[in-house]
């Protein structure tokens, strides 16, 4: 059965200021309405002209954890090569402890070269660095003592406690589009997380992930899939089309090398949104992260009360 998460607005448009009290209220209401999970976006820097304000994802989820009790907390997705993996293991492991075992770790290799330059990480080596960092992080979470020397990292009987609440560790979803990423998702991740994919594109990508899992000697049935979709519940598709297209084309990116597209958008009357989402549910996707139009509280209410009960 498909579960439904909700994206949080820790990332805002140019010239805006993140509304922290509003974010807390949004998270508390999402939990009360029965959403399965909340997902924070991740960048260190994003954009020059314009630039996009973004609150750190791990910090934001930690604050939300203190104000909620049961809703799961996901990074959608953390740019792992930008983080020191030992420090990331500590911060993320602590988040799992603080939240009582609610972390879902979505990770990706990243795409914004300026961000890598600013942090001092070689952009063209991000795939290799991603795999190295993920290996170090998972070792620290799952092994009693870690002894490993790789690149600049020299772990000598490193012990990371307290242990994560989830055993053997929190679930790790690999985000991205190209075959190298899909292979990582199938071979070393617990599943795949993608963004703005139509049902057809999602099915194509997920079949590849499962094939890569089988090649690695893994059972694809142990993996989970997640797709992120923008949703606008209005009176009709005609009424919602222009506003949705403008929002997606001015505040969101779709990678040219992927099949992500603003044409994925779920919009229209409640009945029309239900019909469009049913096409995604039929793909067998395990989780859909909904991005409500402009994160409006009334959209969250309408999605929870008029759309989800009919799926």
Q: Where is each model-derived feature located?
A:
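Short, acidic/polar
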Residues: 17-30, 91, 174-184, 269-279
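Hydrophobic faces of well-ordered beta-strands that scaffold small-molecule active sites
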Residues: 4-8, 38-40, 73-75, 103-107, ...
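A structural motif
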Residues: 35, 100, 189-190, 285-286
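Alpha-helix-loop-beta-strand connector modules within alpha/beta enzyme cores
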Residues: 51-74, 131-136, 140, 305-311
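Active-site mouth loops of central-metabolism enzymes
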Residues: 8-20, 78-86, 168-177, 259-271
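N-terminal small/glycine-rich loop or linker at the start of catalytic domains
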Residues: 1-15, 70, 112-117, 151-169, ...
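N-terminal beta1-alpha1-beta2 module of alpha/beta enzyme domains
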Residues: 1-67, 168-170
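Internal, glycine-rich beta/alpha segment that forms the wall or movable "lid"
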Residues: 2, 50, 84-188, 203-216, ...
